[in-house]
């Protein structure tokens, strides 16, 4: 399950961190808001609930209805929209953590391990393959826990709502579930009662994985220092092992009661249906006093709080910086309380101001701190943050020297006084005004840009403040706040922001807080030593009888995990609920200068989406690993010969919804040994501003500056390469299974080989190499080596062609009929201009040569059957075993996808997560890429998981051979198919309609054929593909990411290739 930090990220630059509040649904229904309002008179009693507030939210095309359950006091929020069939439900609880043992987090897991109505071991995971939901989760925040799902199927909604309510209000909370999901002592070898006793548990290992992420570690230690009263709800691994089972049961009894519950529904299902179900559950409960119990930050609890805190933290072993320059430090100002309803407008102004000061190339803090190399990157807590009752503004940096860390506050104050205030005082002459206009334009676009997860987004935007007493309806009324802001800005201009700063950051008595993390070379070893010490203390306190009990309980738990359960009590959909005919979008086609134009005519609420793609098989393969950097440079370097980057950034934000450039390798849907390279352009705009996208495409493509003699270009590239090198360790820690899979797959197909180069461990190594050269050779490396390569890539991508027909870009449009007609003319003008300004580069088909070398094993990839360990200092590991599968159009592809679901839910979930203690694991089949991937995530024993992967073939064959006796049943097969169709039939973004045809060359006919194959897969098909691909297929390609200090693989072991990633 996910853990949340409620903060406004600097990555949300265009939308101020409230993107999920700014999406308008398409008004396609004939039902007016007046008709909806008439259904909900104030004071009406509906199944034990009384309507307290009804509010139209026209910016979102919905009506908000707030109700209270008369008997228990539970609040319910319903968002009625006839336009969206993707219905959402959630139940949330206020759950203040009493300590750092992780009791709210572990309870979140264990509630989903069986209930009185559904007494099966893990109804949550079992419902994942008995449903057509497109979202199911449970999440723990700082002081709240919530359980949301989304589905387009009304019967499915009813089933899931029943399971969720039973799970949270009447869970079994068995001791076995606590041991499995929380923590336990267990013999390392269950066949040997004398084997060493170790710690195990899903949440325990999840949080060990979190603590391996240095950004998370900095963030959580910062939170503990400034807001210690909240405690660490996720759990500190050092303290999780102090949690008692009785504490878990007591915490549930105290907090999981309707009086402490906030329930939420969204969509087009009638409210009365939801209330009837809720009332059935709640009528057996009495009323409790509602205790919001909002905890306070340290600045309010203690007038003499410690305002300058330093703690020790981990090194970034992949950083090129010396240890003494790996300090992290931040200065934080407390600027308000986000729970104060009267201050909602001030919070919005702060979001705008934070974006103005912190986001993008134009922001003063980026220019003064990053570009001028005071620090290399912003700290994770940088920007505006709203955590419970604390609204704060933080400037923080990574990779500082001790002296710079000590002087950070003076440096930041100097930027405020010498740069920001003078700029604000310029009034209408300030460049800030253009940026304000750009920010407002992005808000307007986000109102219009329809996303399929709209309901989940609205829920996520209100739940953290709602559980703490803020009226959620007020939080949704964005139009009112936005209009007030526009009037205020029109009247007062930039003075409104100067006033904000004068009243807070620049005011001497404003509470502030400095937090620094000192790099500790022995940090990882100390964590390991602390764990060993804790374990030894617990073992020393055990009697021989205790050890016997531990062994017996572990055996019993293992047997229960293996035991086949009767899950007939759980509700389920069937394959009959899946339409045999898929939903397809009509596409039109035309020619533009003999190049294909694909058109999807649909109402897009005043927006137009455009894409272009070009075959770049001619590009020299030596340039592939440079391509992500090149893509990044197009919108992040010094700009173009016509427009500097500061102006270009504003132009993009003021005139469009964004323009992007990227390169990708695509697998041939008929043959996985074939691939093609595509250069893709994307854009989105209001339909009356669409010409700007083509103008920007052309200018950026043809005029981006890569001049070695231009010092601004060199400086920008220096900063960019440094930024890309930051936090690579954290990225791998968060998605280690993806990196392990990518590395394994790179030895199977040419497409996956390229993917690893441009987005996997190969790219991580490449960026590390660039940073190492930057440290040793300085800017000369950029001038003499890197910039000439980037310039040559630009020349090839703009001017090069695959064949003598001078074929270039193909195009696609998604928009209403009028907009598409106008854009056809714009595309022709763009294409003519591009052709007229290009000088053809004669190119060979380099990609064909690479494919040939790959398929004949001439790229040096064959490890001769050896497994690979990517040695990184993580507390937990990630394992991958890859095998070659089948092409998209192969009949085998459908059977392999079904097989992957069966093995995941009917075998691997039990052995990898429940028994081995990993956070997750399974088997996936990439239908487009053709690779099978066994994987584990945040795994304490990745080598054990690898063996489990290898054993899975015999398990699968045994289940199919013994289908009459302890084998896989027709119901199991049905559930596997249901799981697949959760993704196949999930709502899609309107801009992606037709994208499979355009980008992957997968037609509606191919999709329909594959759909029917999914539905028609038999056990005979599964047996055939198991034998063909798992038993007799390609050799096993194994990759493990983890710490060899723990794994202890001998470097001389001929079965292993150990790869150490360092700067």
Swiss-Prot record:
GO MF annotation, one: ATP-dependent peptidase activity
Enzyme Commission designation: 3.4.24.-
Cofactor(s) it depends on: Zn(2+)
SMART domains in UniProt: M16C_associated
TM region positions: none
Cofactor binding summary note: Binds 1 zinc ion per subunit.
Coiled-coil regions listed in the entry: none
UniProt-annotated binding residues for Zn(2+): 105, 109, 206
Active site: 108 (proton acceptor), 181
InterPro entries reported for this sequence: Metalloenz_LuxS/M16, Pept_M16_N, Peptidase_M16_C, Peptidase_M16C_assoc, PreP_C
Protein name: Presequence protease, mitochondrial
Organism for this UniProt entry: Debaryomyces hansenii (strain ATCC 36239 / CBS 767 / BCRC 21394 / JCM 1990 / NBRC 0083 / IGC 2968)
């Amino acid at each position: 399950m996910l853990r949340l930090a409620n903060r406004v990220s600097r990555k949300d630059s265009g939308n101020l961190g409230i993107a999920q509040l700014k999406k308008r649904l398409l008004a396609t229904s004939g039902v007016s808001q007046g008709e909806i309002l008439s259904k909900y008179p104030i004071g009406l009693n509906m199944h034990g609930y009384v309507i307290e507030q009804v509010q139209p939210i026209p910016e979102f095309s919905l009506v908000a209805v707030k109700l209270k359950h008369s008997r228990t006091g539970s609040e319910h929020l319903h968002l009625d929209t006839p336009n969206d069939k993707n219905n959402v439900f959630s139940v949330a609880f206020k759950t203040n953590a009493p300590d750092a043992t992780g009791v709210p987090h572990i309870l979140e897991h264990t509630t989903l391990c069986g209930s009185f109505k559904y007494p099966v071991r893990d109804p949550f995971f079992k419902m994942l393959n008995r449903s057509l939901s497109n979202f199911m989760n449970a999440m723990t925040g700082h002081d709240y826990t919530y359980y949301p799902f989304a589905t387009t199927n009304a019967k499915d909604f009813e089933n899931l709502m029943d399971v969720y309510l039973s799970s949270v209000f009447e869970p079994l909370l068995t001791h076995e579930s606590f041991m499995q999901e929380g923590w336990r002592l267990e013999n390392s070898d269950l066949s040997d009662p004398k084997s060493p006793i170790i710690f195990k548990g899903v949440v325990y290992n999840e949080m060990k994985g979190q603590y391996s992420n240095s950004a998370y570690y900095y963030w959580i230690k910062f939170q503990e220092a400034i807001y210690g009263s909240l405690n660490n709800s996720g759990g500190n691994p050092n303290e999780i092992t102090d949690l008692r089972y009785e504490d878990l049961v007591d915490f549930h009894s105290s907090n999981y009661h309707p009086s402490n519950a906030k329930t939420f529904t969204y969509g087009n299902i009638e409210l009365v249906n939801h209330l009837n179900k809720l009332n059935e559950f709640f009528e057996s409960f009495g009323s409790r006093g509602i205790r919001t119990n909002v905890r306070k930050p340290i600045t309010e609890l203690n007038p003499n709080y410690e305002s300058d805190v330093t703690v020790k933290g981990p090194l970034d072993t992949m950083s090129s910086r010396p240890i003494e320059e790996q300090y992290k430090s931040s200065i934080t100002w407390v600027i308000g309380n986000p729970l104060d309803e009267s201050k909602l407008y001030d919070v919005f102004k702060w979001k705008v101001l934070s974006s103005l000061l912190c986001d993008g190339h134009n922001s003063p803090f980026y220019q003064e701190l990053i570009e001028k190399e005071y620090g290399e990157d912003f700290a994770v807590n940088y920007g505006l943050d709203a955590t419970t009752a604390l609204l704060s503004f933080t400037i923080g940096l990574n990779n500082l020297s001790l002296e710079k860390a000590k002087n950070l506050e003076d440096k930041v104050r100097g930027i405020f006084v010498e740069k920001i205030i003078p700029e604000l005082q310029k009034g209408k002459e300030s460049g800030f005004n253009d940026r304000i206009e750009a920010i407002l334009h992005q808000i307007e676009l986000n109102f219009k840009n329809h996303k399929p997860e709209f309901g989940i987004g609205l829920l996520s935007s209100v739940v953290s403040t709602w559980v703490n007493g803020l009226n959620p309806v007020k939080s949704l009324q964005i139009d009112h706040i936005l209009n007030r802001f526009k009037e205020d800005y029109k009247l007062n201009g930039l003075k409104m922001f100067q006033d904000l700063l004068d009243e807070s950051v620049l005011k001497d008595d404003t509470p502030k807080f400095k937090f620094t993390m000192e790099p500790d070379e022995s940090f990882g070893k100390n964590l390991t030593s602390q764990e060993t010490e804790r374990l030894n203390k617990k073992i020393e306190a055990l009697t021989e009888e205790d050890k016997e009990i531990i062994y017996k309980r572990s055996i019993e738990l293992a047997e229960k995990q293996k035991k086949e359960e009767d899950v007939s009590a759980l509700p389920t959909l069937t394959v009959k609920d899946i339409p045999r005919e898929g939903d397809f979008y009509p596409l039109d086609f035309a020619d533009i200068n003999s190049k294909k134009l694909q058109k999807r005519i649909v109402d897009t609420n005043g927006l137009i989406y455009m894409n272009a793609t070009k075959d770049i098989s001619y590009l020299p393969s030596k340039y592939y690993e440079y391509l992500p950097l090149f893509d990044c440079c197009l919108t992040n370097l010094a700009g173009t010969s016509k427009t500097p980057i500061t102006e270009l950034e504003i132009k993009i934000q003021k005139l469009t919804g964004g323009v992007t450039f990227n390169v990708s390798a695509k697998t041939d849907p008929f043959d996985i040994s074939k691939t093609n390279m595509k250069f893709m352009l994307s854009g989105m705009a209001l339909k009356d501003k669409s010409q700007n996208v083509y103008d920007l495409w052309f200018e950026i493509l043809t005029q981006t500056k890569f001049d070695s003699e231009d010092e601004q270009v060199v400086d920008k590239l220096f900063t960019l390469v440094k930024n890309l090198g930051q936090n690579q360790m954290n990225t791998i820690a968060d998605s280690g299974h993806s990196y392990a899979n990518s590395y394994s797959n790179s030895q199977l197909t040419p497409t996956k080989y390229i993917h690893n180069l441009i987005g996997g461990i190969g790219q991580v190594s490449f960026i590390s190499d660039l940073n190492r050269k930057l440290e040793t050779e300085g800017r000369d490396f950029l001038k003499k080596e890197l910039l000439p390569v980037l310039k040559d890539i630009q020349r090839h991508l703009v001017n090069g062609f695959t064949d003598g027909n001078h074929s270039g870009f193909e195009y696609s449009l998604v928009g209403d009929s009028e907009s598409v007609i106008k854009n056809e003319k714009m595309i022709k003008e763009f294409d003519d201009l591009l052709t007229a300004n290009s000088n053809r580069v004669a190119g060979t088909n380099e990609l064909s040569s690479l494919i040939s070398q790959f398929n004949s094993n001439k790229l040096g990839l064959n490890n001769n059957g050896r497994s690979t360990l990517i040695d990184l200092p993580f507390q937990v590991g990630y394992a991958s075993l890859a095998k070659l599968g089948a092409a998209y159009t192969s009949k085998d592809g459908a059977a392999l996808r079904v097989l992957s679901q069966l093995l995941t839910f009917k075998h691997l979930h039990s052995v990898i997560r429940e028994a081995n203690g990993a956070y997750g694991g399974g088997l996936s089949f990439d239908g487009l890429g053709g690779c099978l991937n066994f994987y584990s995530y945040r795994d304490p024993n990745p080598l054990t998981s690898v063996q489990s992967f290898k054993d899975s073939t015999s398990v699968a064959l045994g289940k199919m051979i013994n289908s009459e006796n302890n084998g896989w049943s027709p119901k199991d097969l049905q559930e596997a198919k249901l799981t697949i169709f959760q993704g196949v039939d999930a709502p899609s973004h309107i801009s992606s309609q037709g994208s499979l045809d355009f980008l992957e060359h997968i037609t509606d006919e191919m999709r329909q054929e594959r759909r029917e194959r999914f539905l028609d897969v038999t056990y005979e098909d599964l047996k055939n593909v198991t034998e063909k691909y798992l038993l007799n297929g390609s050799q096993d390609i194994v990759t493990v990411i983890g710490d060899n200090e723990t794994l202890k693989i001998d470097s001389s072991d001929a079965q292993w290739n150990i790869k150490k990633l360092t700067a």
